[in-house]
Amino acid sequence: MRNAILIALLRLPLALMLFILVAPAKAGSFTETDKSVRLIVSGIVSYTRWPALSGQPKLCIYASSHYRQALSSEDEHNPLPYSPVIVHSDRDALTARCDALYFGSESPAKQQEIINQYQDQALLLMSEQNPECVIGSAFCLIIEHNQVRFSVNLDALARSGVRVNPDVLMLARNKKHE
C-alpha cells in the first residue's frame, strides 16, 4: 500500500510536466486560417443581439466543419463569446436548443432544410461551404489561399430574428478584413 502511494506521488510531477509541455502545444497548434475563422466567428457573434437571450449564446457547430476544433477550444487568453456545442446531426442541433448554427460541409440546400425546422426562433446562421451565400446561412465564410473573409445574405439575416451591428455588415463589403 505504501509503495503504491509512493509510486503515485512520483508519477504526479511527471504527469504535471507532461501537461505543461503538451497544453501550450495544443493551444498553439492552430494555423493562421484557424485563428482567422475563430476571430471572425467570435466577432460576428459578439456584435449580434437576440431578442430574448440572457448570457452567452449557444453556438452549435456541425461536426463536418473543418474548423470545429478552433471554434470550440477554450483559450484563457481569448475567451469565446459563445458556448460551443459540437453537433453530429440535425436532431442533435434541435435538441441542443441552439442560438446560432455554424455549418460545415452541409450544402446550401441542406442548410435551408435545417433552418426551416427552427420556426419562429431567433437564430444566427453561419457557414464555411456556401460561397455564393444566396440561400441558407446569413454569414458565409470565404476561405481562399489561407485568407478568410465573409459575405452576408441580407435576406437570410432579415428572416433570422437576430440583430447585427451595421459595422459588421460594412466589413462584409470590405474585402480586406481577413
Residue ranges and their predicted role:
Residues 11-21:
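Bacterial N-terminal signal peptides
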Residues 2-8, 25-178:
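Short hydrophobic alpha-helices and adjacent helix-cap/hinge residues
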